[in-house]
């Protein structure tokens, strides 16, 4: 019998497992307090979608695996491949990304809705940072 009832639960389980893997690697490098480790996790792995959208806005349409490579080059984020695919799939289902077939390849590009959501998210982050500054 299948442990998961629907694809959303499978997605959550896969992301949870991969988040834990990524955090362990990052935590060993940083050696920070637990509070700071949680903050880093929340602002990177758990909000990976904003990084994916930024990469696609800067570099244009690309394959999911290339997104993974650019996440490392641009932000220094080592993200498991399955996590990138999961996030990209979720963003497509939400209309933030669009899947485009080019010959035998499938690339992803940001939709107009994706640009709007990215700008809203960035504005929210900037607002929070300005309120947190001393």
Task: Name each model feature, range by range.
Residues 45-47, 57-66:
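Short capping segments at the starts of secondary-structure elements
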Residues 54-60, 72, 122:
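Short, locally clustered residues in the helix-turn-helix/winged-helix DNA-binding domain
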Residues 65-76:
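DNA-recognition alpha helix
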Residues 85-90:
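Short, hydrophobic-biased segments on the C-terminal half of alpha helices
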Residues 115-134:
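Amphipathic alpha-helical dimerization/coiled-coil segments
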Residues 15, 21-42:
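Short, Lys/Arg-enriched N-terminal segment that forms or immediately precedes the first helix
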Residues 92-103, 109:
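Beta-hairpin "wing" of winged helix-turn-helix
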């Amino acid at each position: 019998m299948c442990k998961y009832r629907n694809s959303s639960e499978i997605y959550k389980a896969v992301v949870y497992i991969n988040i834990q893997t990524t955090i362990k690697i990052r935590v060993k490098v940083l050696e920070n307090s637990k509070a700071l480790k949680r903050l880093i996790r929340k602002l990177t792995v758990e909000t990976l979608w904003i990084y994916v959208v930024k990469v696609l806005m800067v570099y244009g349409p690309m394959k999911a695996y290339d997104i993974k490579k650019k996440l490392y080059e641009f932000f220094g984020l080592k993200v498991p491949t399955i996590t990138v695919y999961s996030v990209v799939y979720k963003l497509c289902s939400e209309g933030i990304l669009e899947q485009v077939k080019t010959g035998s390849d499938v690339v992803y590009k940001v939709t107009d809705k994706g640009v709007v959501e990215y700008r809203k998210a960035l504005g929210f982050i900037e607002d929070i940072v300005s309120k947190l500054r001393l």
